[in-house]
Amino acid sequence: MHFYIPPPPISGFWLGPLYVHMYSVFMLAGALVLFELTNRRFIVLTGNREFTAFAVTSLLIPVILGARLWHVVSHTQMYEHQPFYKVFAIWEGGLGFIGGVFSGLICFFVIAKIKKVPPFTFLDALAPGILAALCFARLGNYFNGEVFGTETTLPWGLKLSHEGFKDLNVEKYFHPIFLYEIILNVFIIVILLVLEKRVFVKTVFPKGSVFAAFLVLYGLGRFALEPMRYNLQQNSFGLDLNYVGAAAMIIVGVLIACRHTIASGKLRNSGD
């Protein structure tokens, strides 16, 4: 007998005249968790009680746009024969996490400079919250029928419903990549917190090391998961952008961790 993960029972529900997608519910829950965790951590680190709310609200649109753009560019063939508005239909799913990270990071440094906030201190506070929010987003992917893998005979294989998967053998089972990534994210959160409490505070690691570790560890994790991931559509460039993005995350993480050495050899107590 095969103990599989069943298809999602629902994709959403009616709230009066409004149809609410489960994907949206989990995305909202993730955003709230990200804000709460980051705000608490940043208050402990700096005493600043206002900046987190400003940063999260200011970065919301750039992050969504970057994530959506990454998804569309990664799956151009999916939209070639679709109505143009489908490019913007984020309620149907399709946000590329890596694109959101980089668009948010670029915009964040701008607002941090304007507000005169130590950027790497905030990024350290932010890192665990990003991963926690992504766990909720991956649950939303399950309800949207996204982020699954290739066929598997493992007992925790994912069973897909017929709707939307006519090109697949729905009698088979597939790797639940969304679940693997949730486990990966929780594992990285634990590592980050241990490093923060046991290593970074006792040594000369610069501020930003927690965020740098997040980028490197998540990038490595994506490299491990991508070969198992099933892509319903490919982009028109013959290039898997998720590998490129994962490599970029690792490189940026290493540069952030080494920036003091590269620039002037400053230590942690020299500030941001």
Swiss-Prot record:
It comes from Tropheryma whipplei (strain Twist) (Whipple's bacillus). GO terms for cellular component: plasma membrane. Catalyzes the transfer of the diacylglyceryl group from phosphatidylglycerol to the sulfhydryl group of the N-terminal cysteine of a prolipoprotein, the first step in the formation of mature lipoproteins. One of its GO terms (molecular function) is phosphatidylglycerol-prolipoprotein diacylglyceryl transferase activity. The keyword Aminoacyl-tRNA synthetase does not apply. Its main location: membrane. This is Phosphatidylglycerol--prolipoprotein diacylglyceryl transferase. The chain crosses the membrane at residues 15-35, 53-73, 90-110, 117-137, 174-194, 199-219, 237-257. GO terms for biological process: lipoprotein biosynthetic process.
